[in-house]
């Protein structure tokens, strides 16, 4: 049985979120939460909140034991890009891409 949680349109570039997500793939849930707690990246509180949501989904919806959960699949997809302009010298402007990401966490029982 799998329990899943998805966070969409997170305002952090997917390349940066993947650095955090790669740390917890395949780990037990308690260990993954400890790793995220001590990771000094902007994406780690977001991934930690999503992992807690997946644990709650497993407990409530599927009646799984939270102590026997393992992070099965975790992946980050690119979301829509917000396009903005930054004023530059001599009346010009350059385009800025504010990237978003979709994060998915799937938990399995050990």
Curated annotation (Swiss-Prot):
<dbReference type="GO" id="GO:0019843">
    <property type="term" value="F:rRNA binding"/>
</dbReference>
<dbReference type="GO" id="GO:0003735">
    <property type="term" value="F:structural constituent of ribosome"/>
</dbReference>
<comment type="similarity">
    <text>Belongs to the universal ribosomal protein uL22 family.</text>
</comment>
<dbReference type="GO" id="GO:0006412">
    <property type="term" value="P:translation"/>
</dbReference>
<dbReference type="GO" id="GO:0022625">
    <property type="term" value="C:cytosolic large ribosomal subunit"/>
</dbReference>
<comment type="function">
    <text>This protein binds specifically to 23S rRNA; its binding is stimulated by other ribosomal proteins, e.g. L4, L17, and L20. It is important during the early stages of 50S assembly. It makes multiple contacts with different domains of the 23S rRNA in the assembled 50S subunit and ribosome.</text>
</comment>
<dbReference type="InterPro" id="IPR001063">
    <property type="entry name" value="Ribosomal_uL22"/>
</dbReference>
<comment type="function">
    <text>The globular domain of the protein is located near the polypeptide exit tunnel on the outside of the subunit, while an extended beta-hairpin is found that lines the wall of the exit tunnel in the center of the 70S ribosome.</text>
</comment>
<dbReference type="InterPro" id="IPR018260">
    <property type="entry name" value="Ribosomal_uL22_CS"/>
</dbReference>
<dbReference type="InterPro" id="IPR047867">
    <property type="entry name" value="Ribosomal_uL22_bac/org-type"/>
</dbReference>
<dbReference type="InterPro" id="IPR036394">
    <property type="entry name" value="Ribosomal_uL22_sf"/>
</dbReference>
<dbReference type="InterPro" id="IPR005727">
    <property type="entry name" value="Ribosomal_uL22_bac/chlpt-type"/>
</dbReference>
<comment type="subunit">
    <text>Part of the 50S ribosomal subunit.</text>
</comment>
<keyword id="KW-0694">RNA-binding</keyword>
<keyword id="KW-0687">Ribonucleoprotein</keyword>
<protein>
    <recommendedName>
        <fullName>Large ribosomal subunit protein uL22</fullName>
    </recommendedName>
</protein>
<keyword id="KW-0689">Ribosomal protein</keyword>
<keyword id="KW-0699">rRNA-binding</keyword>
<dbReference type="Pfam" id="PF00237">
    <property type="entry name" value="Ribosomal_L22"/>
</dbReference>
């Amino acid at each position: 049985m799998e329990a899943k949680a998805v966070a969409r349109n997170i305002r952090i570039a997917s390349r940066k979120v993947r650095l955090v997500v790669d740390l917890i793939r395949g780990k037990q849930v308690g260990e993954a939460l400890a790793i995220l707690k001590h990771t000094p990246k902007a994406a780690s509180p977001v991934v930690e909140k999503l992992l807690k949501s997946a644990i709650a989904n497993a407990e409530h919806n599927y009646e799984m034991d939270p102590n026997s959960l393992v992070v099965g699949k975790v992946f980050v997809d690119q979301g829509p890009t917000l396009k903005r302009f930054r004023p530059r010298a001599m009346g010009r402007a350059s385009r800025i891409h504010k990237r978003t990401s979709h994060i998915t966490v799937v938990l399995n029982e050990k």
